[in-house]
Amino acid sequence: VYGWDQGKLYKPDYRYLEEENADVALRYTDDSFESYDNIFRNARTEISDDDRKRLIDALKILSEASGGTEEDGEELSEAVNVDGALRYFTVQSFVVNLDSYLGPTGHNYFLHERDGILTILPWDYNLAFATYSLGMPEPINDAELYVNYPIDTPASGQIMMERPLFHN
């Protein structure tokens, strides 16, 4: 069975789109397990309180790292599979997957944790290639816009600032 000796697997997802869903954005808010219900409620493997604490500790490191110094980068690598995150965001940007961690809903990814290291994994690409239009009364139907979508800003500035896995 997956997860017994290979880490823990989560499928973070929001309960209500109208809520802030900081946990789905992988933002550290406090040490309370209840603050991360959208992660723990969607665990795909059995988890213990030790597993919950380890994940929250990793989120704290992720949220507190600014990425501005070499020390921040070293600390970040103690909590995040940095190479895996860079690969994930490269693909997300290339296929303009707005129904993902970088989209308005910030979901449709798996989160793997092993030994305190978080790895983001892709999931659900059915709305990739700029076909996502949730909340758009008149969806943008401009292929040229999406072909030229900027790879260095794959989401709005506000969304990017609220997603520490991308921002930091």
Give a label for each model feature.
Residues V1-N168:
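Phosphate/dinucleotide-binding and metal-coordinating scaffold of catalytic cores
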